[in-house]
UniProtKB/Swiss-Prot annotation:
Regulation: Non-allosteric.
Enzymatic reactions: beta-D-fructose 6-phosphate + diphosphate = beta-D-fructose 1,6-bisphosphate + phosphate + H(+)
Organism classification: Bacteria, Pseudomonadati, Pseudomonadota, Gammaproteobacteria, Methylococcales
Name this protein carries in UniProt: Pyrophosphate--fructose 6-phosphate 1-phosphotransferase
Annotated active site: 153 (proton acceptor)
Coarse class of the protein's main subcellular location: cytoplasm
Signal sequence annotation: none
Length: 409
């Protein structure tokens, strides 16, 4: 055992319902094992690391770390910073001209006396951590980097279940449980529920499934119009599945004629290629973030789907609602807390043996929970549309399963 003297924690990327709980779990576990180990938390992710801006974890914080399980977001703050995007780091004032952000980060860790860095984030955060770990190893810094996999998209290779995704699906379902009643407000209403998920439909599919569980647990009174058919999910559209717009419009028009409303769940990554092609044809700029990803909130897939379907199904009013920020900022649910604690416990164990990697259930190694080697971590894992529960759900709502589509990341 090679006990660390000082560890650092940072959270980065977009929010997910696990960040606060993961911070709390790491602080709790280190305190249980050896409270003499110093802990700091970098403020606003890699930004704080580059600027040397951190919180010291005091005895009071250790005593009250359990409070973090009750909150969403990240109390220590996030940012989207790519250490290998030198131009962006300079533009944002995080490093000076001529500086290498990776070296600045590495030197700051040494200056702060950090032995182990815990990064909590998605594929971008952990690929950034992988780059940093490789830089540290190549230049003999002797620091250990251990990642925890956060993403509501559940799209990280080769990790079976990323932290926060279960909660996000549950919260998205609860969000739509309120929104759906808007169909009462107008005849022939089309409600489009846009769910987060860049190039992965897992969250959209899982949210629809969780929402239908809520419907299963409800009592109905169709005699006065309280009919499950009107509250039902009528269509689920994900990037990995081909969409026959004409056939779906015909099917959904029949639903509209029968129940006076249509409710569809759309992944924010569905139809993006078509939307981007439209924008470029019009000479419009496609906005991207520091990692080169298209800014999906600017592209607005839900609006596009609404426009495509509205006329074809005879909708009098179209309502587009996005559950993403509501879902991703939630506190962790019981299932996620259990997963987070098991991952955090192993992360601390790995810290004591100085084993770098990303903690997760390794799909290529029998789903064993382990520190997965950084070079094997990558984003863009597609949702398997042949997953039995998804196939059953499509059959249950009367939607034909489209052909598989290869998605780019």
């Amino acid at each position: 055992m090679n006990k660390p003297k000082k560890v650092a924690i940072l959270t980065a990327g977009g929010l997910a319902p696990c960040l606060s709980s993961a911070i709390g779990s790491l602080i709790e576990r280190y305190t249980e094992i050896d409270p003499s180990i110093e802990i700091i938390c970098y403020r606003s992710g890699y930004k704080g690391l580059l600027l040397g801006d951190s919180y010291a974890v005091t005895p009071k914080i250790r005593e009250n770390a359990a409070l973090l399980h009750k909150f969403g977001g990240s109390p220590i703050g996030n940012s989207r910073v790519k250490l290998t995007n030198v131009k962006d780091c300079i533009k944002r004032g995080l490093v000076q001209e001529g500086q290498d952000p990776q070296k600045v980060a590495a030197d700051q860790l040494v200056k702060d006396g950090v032995d182990v860095l815990h990064t909590i984030g998605g594929d971008d955060t952990n690929t950034a951590a992988a780059d940093l770990a490789a830089f540290l190893a190549k230049n003999d810094y002797g620091l250990t980097v251990i990642g925890l996999p956060k993403t509501i998209d559940n799209d990280v290779f080769p990790i079976k279940q990323s932290l926060g995704a279960w909660t996000a699906a549950e919260q998205g379902a609860q969000y739509f449980q309120n929104v759906v009643a808007e169909y009462n407000a107008n005849p022939r209403m089309l409600i489009v529920h846009e769910v987060m998920g860049r190039n992965c439909g897992w969250l959209t599919a899982a949210t629809a499934m969780e929402y239908r569980k809520l419907l299963d647990r409800s009592e109905w009174l169709p005699e006065i119009g309280l009919d499950r058919a009107a509250y039902e999910v009528h269509g689920v559209f994900v990037p990995e599945m081909e969409i026959d717009l004409a056939a779906e419009a015909k099917r959904l028009r029949e639903v509209m004629d029968k129940v006076d409303c249509v409710n569809i769940f759309v992944s924010e990554g569905a139809g993006v290629d078509a939307i981007v092609a439209e924008m470029q044809a019009k000479g419009q700029e496609v906005p991207r973030d520091a990692f080169g990803h298209i800014k999906l909130d600017a592209v607005n897939p839900g609006k596009w789907f609404g426009e495509q379907f509205a006329e074809m199904i005879g909708a009098e009013k179209t309502l587009i609602q996005k559950s993403g920020y509501f879902a991703r900022a939630s506190a962790s649910n019981v299932d996620d807390i259990r997963l987070i604690k098991s991952c955090a416990d192993l992360a601390v164990e790995c810290a004591f043996r100085r084993e770098s990697g990303v903690i997760g259930h390794d799909e290529d190694n029998g789903n064993v929970l382990r520190a997965i080697e950084f070079p094997r971590i990558k984003g863009g894992k597609p949702f398997d549309i042949d997953t039995p529960w998804f196939v059953q759900m499509l059959a249950g709502i009367g939607q034909s399963k489209g052909a598989r589509v290869e998605v780019s990341h």
